[in-house]
């Protein structure tokens, strides 16, 4: 029997990143989603195209050998598929992990295969597989938890690939940047060995990869979006052509770089080169990346372990500079009532309804005693008072 991977989430990252590399590694991919239209489209089309976009031009890969199941209506089928799968991946958004955990737990519990299934969450979040693992344990009966690791192994991953806004008529096809990084920790697999997926860079310690990526790629992308939105720019590439915005983004990245160099075994020179590469990537006009798309979901992006408060809190704890990150936080706080983005409306509501102290705690998860708290509180007050 051939290799089989279950991919939760049929969105652009699921189809255009994870499934592409699973397909290239020889896996049959079973997409699991709750969106009727997405599942039906995957069921009705036997192939779709992933087009890599770069300055050198375009390269298209046709993805085949996949199926799709609606977990809302066919949960028992999903359980059976997981029971005989080699790999389970997901790209659903960090907030959705708790909703997919119950069916994954049932699927793992139904396994009789001698080799455990590899579970890898592919989310823009630190320790996403650990989070999913925790939810799966909650949905596993107590007498089965101890033997859970005979049936499944859990490895965190760091993913990096920019997926711009897709054309409205693109269907299942995905346009995506050529560059990618997919790092996964190999230690959890022990003597069993990790799955054979050539696109994955298997590492002993994932934290440097995750933090470097989140605090460089995601921080710079969102910073560009929030400053760009504030200044009326429509596209990320246009925003970065504005010398002032580009300078502000570089100042933010100098601060996150100082943390990465201080904390991880990465030299100043190496991080500087990485920063230049990232700014060049997000400046790519061929990606046609929309400012409001990149800025959406500001509540998640302002949260405790995310791209702004995550590095700023660690810098504050180390007594290091974080002023430019606070400028970015202020711009994120000003990303309110953007059409099509529920979180930006909720952000506006929180800032309007709650006192500054409550809003600061609720938005960022920072304790009042934390050294970063006063600086964030100042920005919240400033935005609430409507001062520029």
From Swiss-Prot:
Binding site for NAD(+): 5-16
Keywords tagged on the record: NAD, Oxidoreductase
Protein EC: 1.1.1.17
GO annotations of cellular component type: cytosol
Active site: 213
Enzymatic reactions: D-mannitol 1-phosphate + NAD(+) = beta-D-fructose 6-phosphate + NADH + H(+)
SUPFAM superfamilies: 6-phosphogluconate dehydrogenase C-terminal domain-like, NAD(P)-binding Rossmann-fold domains
Keyword Nucleotidyltransferase set for record: no
A GO molecular function held by the record: mannitol-1-phosphate 5-dehydrogenase activity
Keyword NAD: yes
One family name in Pfam for this protein: Mannitol_dh
Enzyme kind, highest EC tier: oxidoreductase
Highest taxon of source: Eukaryota
InterPro entries, per database record: 6-PGluconate_DH-like_C_sf (IPR008927), 6PGD_dom2 (IPR013328), Mannitol_1_phos_5_DH (IPR023028), Mannitol_DH (IPR000669), Mannitol_DH_C (IPR013118), Mannitol_DH_N (IPR013131), NAD(P)-bd_dom_sf (IPR036291)
An annotated GO BP: mannitol catabolic process
Family: Belongs to the mannitol dehydrogenase family.
Function statement: Catalyzes the NAD(H)-dependent interconversion of D-fructose 6-phosphate and D-mannitol 1-phosphate in the metabolism of mannitol. Has a strong preference for NADH over NADPH.
HAMAP family to which the protein is assigned, alphabetical: Mannitol_dehydrog (MF_00196)
Subunit structure, interactors included: Monomer.
Name of the protein: Mannitol-1-phosphate 5-dehydrogenase
Organism in which the protein naturally occurs: Aspergillus niger (strain ATCC MYA-4892 / CBS 513.88 / FGSC A1513)
